[in-house]
Amino acid sequence: MRVKPDLSFRRLWDISFGFFGVQIAYALQSANISRIFATLGADPHNLSYFWILPPLAGIIVQPIVGALSDRTWNRFGRRIPYLIAGSAIAVAVMCLLPNAASFKGYIHAMWFGLIALMMLDTFINMAMQPFKMLVGDMVNERQKGLAYSIQSFLSNAGSLVGYLFPILFTYIGISNIAAPGVIPDSVIFSFYGGAAILILCTLYSSIRVKEMPPAEFRKFHQISDKELTEKNNFISLLRHAPKVFWTVGLVQFFCWSAFMYMWTYSTGAIADNVWHSTDPAFPTNQPGTGRAYYSPYKP
């Protein structure tokens, strides 16, 4: 098996740069969705019901995208087509979701918001996974630690920017207060800004990154033509998964259980316990919550 050549730091950066935009989108979703549904009239105690569809969609969509991209070879690459498609649809949904209040009637707004949330989570995941796969495809074993460190840095930087967006827009004078049932401009503009950055970051990585052609990929990964076209079902893959897969999977299971509680309830819980209000229209509610989250990051 041939050893993949070392890549320059710039090349490693380019492979993962789109991750910055993806994580901004994820942060906007996780920080603001509960607020959006509460603004539309959802009971704060029932917010978890709205968060059920995204992970259900992810359970179905992510394995399908992974399996399809493993067998996709065209002039645009192997992973890049899914990255572009996922980002493009996620951007469209990000522009539509904060306008759910435009629908007349509580039921219509809720259904639109619910479907938009499911699509947003699904296609953000579709845009995110190819970046992880690109590292495995293109980076040699010696540099993978550096490549994933760059990806982790961009991930955390994007999350921080996404979480702070509504605060920054409020700081420059965009209203964080709106009439009952109306989503504030600070949240709407945050989603617009996140959508713009997501598509720009994705285009940058898509243009800068050139994936290996199939023949070269097979040489570097010691894959035969038969193995490349061989189909393994989900049960077979689980049966032959290494021990580390199950170890990491168990840890991830409990981590993501905690994340879901945090994303669903922490905004309302902090607002209720600190400012004694869960009303989304309360003037100091949401920006104060954001400052409480990120006060450790501020000088």
PLM features: residue spans?
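C-terminal ends and interior cores of transmembrane alpha-helices
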Residues: P81-I107
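Intracellular helix-loop hinge segments at the cytoplasmic ends of transmembrane helices
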Residues: R35, K132-M138, G268
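Short helix-loop-helix connector
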Residues: G41-A42, S69, W73, F123, ...
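Transmembrane alpha-helical cores of Major Facilitator Superfamily
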Residues: F20, Y49-L56, M118, S149-A157, ...
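Central cavity-lining transmembrane alpha-helices of secondary-active solute carriers
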Residues: L47-T72, A85-M94, A157-Y163, P299
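Intracellular loop-helix junctions on the cytosolic face of multi-pass helical membrane proteins
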Residues: M1-R10, A101, Y106-I115, M126-A127, ...
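Helix-loop boundary and gating motifs at the non-cytosolic
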Residues: M1-A57, W246-V251, C255-P283
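Juxtamembrane helix-start elements in MFS-like secondary transporters
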Residues: D43-W51, R79, A109, G113, ...
